[in-house]
Amino acid sequence: MRVKICGITQPQQSVAIASLGATALGFICVPSSPRYVTAAQIWAAVAPLPKNIDKIGVFANSSIAEIKQTVIDCGLTGVQLHGDETPEFCDQLRRSLPQVEILKALRVRSLEHLEQAIIYTQYINTLLLDAYHPQQLGGTGQTLDWQMLHKFHPSCPWLLAGGLTPDNILEALSQLNPDGIDLSSGVERKPGDKDLDKVALLFEKLGSRN
């Protein structure tokens, strides 16, 4: 199962989190976010990582040109779209960056949002389902209604996000079978500052499932 830790801001933490077991790291390219990092900061965190770690930039309502430039400058392997991007935009981006994984994050609060998610599947590589918040795009600490997702079986891989922590991850995975999980605020001391003890506890809990 993929494990993505999002909102990385410090190079030394990126290396430590990868060594603890993360398969993907996320870097926030949204200037209004408290976890925002510049291209130079992303490169500093990405450069020492092993090749097998996915390096994903998180964007919201950015232009294709801006996204493409950041991918090139930072050596990103994936782009996560967390804004109001349309399926058509996702398709254009995927054609523009054919070697890069395209993830679309959707903030879910109703079955209608889940139906919308299905529309995206043919234009992207991976879906990410997050909790809805009217102001914030992610990292809110709010959980999804897991029960609503019981019958969610999209045609592409999907990641579960939204308020996941080392304390509730086993409960979430007992109810759902996502292809991966995405954590941010649930393993932090404060926005952008990851708590390595919590990250270690997360992988300890995940290891106990085997």
UniProtKB/Swiss-Prot annotation:
Gene3D superfamilies listed in its UniProt record: Aldolase class I (3.20.20.70)
Keywords: Amino-acid biosynthesis, Aromatic amino acid biosynthesis, Isomerase, Tryptophan biosynthesis
Pathway in which the depicted protein is active: Amino-acid biosynthesis; L-tryptophan biosynthesis; L-tryptophan from chorismate: step 3/5
E.C. number(s) listed in UniProt: 5.3.1.24
InterPro entries reported for this sequence: Aldolase_TIM, PRAI_dom, RibuloseP-bd_barrel, TrpF_fam
Catalytic reactions of this protein: N-(5-phospho-beta-D-ribosyl)anthranilate = 1-(2-carboxyphenylamino)-1-deoxy-D-ribulose 5-phosphate
Pfam families linked: PRAI
Domain of life from the UniProt record: Bacteria
Keyword Isomerase part of the UniProt annotation: yes
MF annotations from Gene Ontology: phosphoribosylanthranilate isomerase activity
CDD domains for this protein: PRAI (cd00405)
GO biological process, one term: L-tryptophan biosynthetic process
Entry similarity comment: Belongs to the TrpF family.
Name recorded for this polypeptide: N-(5'-phosphoribosyl)anthranilate isomerase
